[in-house]
């Protein structure tokens, strides 16, 4: 799989990574055996970026990844974890002492002395803007608790604030055919600064899988049931903030523009990876088949699929169905 530089770290990561929220919680139950099989399938397909967080399954996702990688001592996988959601989202909780506690817990979960990459997990804007935040992170780099750091954000304005900081390695932001604002507002600035962009929620919580209908239901403990209106956390995290029924209309139009041999999720992932300034898209997977299909989408970057035509369709559908409702929100 094609690899791209991770900021200024000297490391390369795959253009399609693996998001592991699904292996922790909030998507229904996934067994340990199934989770391990997903990790193996992704790694065997050339994925060299695993994205996780200390709150995914209260550390379960990190622990599963740590155990898996311990069995592959020669792996080339970069593990990007996140911190900051274990306490109420108040700026005072983003303190050096809490950073240390969270980092040490993740190091134990992953079984490593130095974390590859730690990202603040969608913190309040005041945290992103504070000099003290980056001073504390720089101290963790200096003592080799972490090798690099970045920020996962909700809004384009937050992304730009993080990109302006000299030692930020990456920014995570939602980018997919339902979220186009970052293409013009964030990606050029990231390219100029040498900051990597991870496109998170690349399949809009599965909506871009093309498998859902108006009668589809989800488990009670699945955020696609309990967070559609932002009841538990930012509603942009669920279906990218798009109304489910409107999203289905958009999916229908996007799918109709594809040749029969190209699936909508594969086209979406390839489109994301082809956007200038994107380093990696990080789709999640709950099964070996999903993990393999996501990784295989990278092959569309090598030709045989008209990405320019799909881009034109994406932009038209966005303008017709989505722009008015969501463009100004994030």
Where are the language model's segments positioned?
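Active-site groove signature of glycoside hydrolases
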Residues: 107-126
């Amino acid at each position: 799989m094609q690899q791209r530089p991770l900021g200024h770290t000297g490391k390369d990561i795959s253009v399609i990574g693996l998001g592991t929220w699904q292996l922790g919680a909030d998507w229904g139950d996934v067994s340990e055996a199934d989770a391990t099989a997903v990790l193996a399938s992704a790694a065997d397909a050339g994925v060299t970026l695993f994205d996780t967080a200390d709150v995914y399954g209260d550390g379960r996702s990190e622990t599963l990844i740590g155990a898996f990688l311990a069995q592959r001592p020669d792996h080339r996988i970069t593990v990007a974890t996140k911190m900051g959601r274990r306490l109420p989202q108040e700026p005072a909780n983003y303190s050096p002492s809490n950073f240390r506690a969270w980092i040490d817990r993740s190091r134990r979960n992953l079984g490593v002395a130095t974390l590859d990459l730690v990202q603040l997990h969608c913190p309040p804007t005041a945290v992103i803007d504070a000099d003290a935040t980056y001073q504390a992170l720089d101290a963790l780099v200096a003592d080799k608790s972490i090798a690099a750091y970045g920020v996962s954000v909700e809004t384009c304005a937050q992304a730009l604030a993080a990109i302006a900081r000299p030692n930020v390695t990456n920014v995570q932001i939602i980018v997919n055919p339902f979220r186009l604002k970052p293409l013009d507002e964030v990606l050029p600035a990231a390219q100029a600064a040498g900051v990597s962009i991870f496109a998170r929620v690349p399949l809009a919580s599965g909506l871009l899988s093309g498998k859902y209908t108006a009668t589809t239901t989800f488990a009670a403990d699945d955020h696609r049931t309990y967070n559609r209106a932002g009841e538990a956390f930012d509603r942009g995290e669920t279906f990218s903030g798009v109304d489910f029924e409107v999203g289905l209309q958009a999916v229908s139009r996007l799918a109709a523009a594809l040749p029969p041999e190209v699936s909508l999720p594969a086209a979406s992932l390839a489109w994301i990876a082809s956007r200038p300034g994107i380093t990696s898209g990080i789709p999640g997977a709950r099964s070996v088949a999903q993990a393999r299909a996501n990784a295989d989408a990278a092959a569309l970057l090598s030709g045989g699929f008209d990405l320019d035509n799909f881009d034109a369709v994406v932009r038209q559908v966005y303008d017709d169905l989505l722009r008015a409702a969501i463009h100004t929100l994030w």
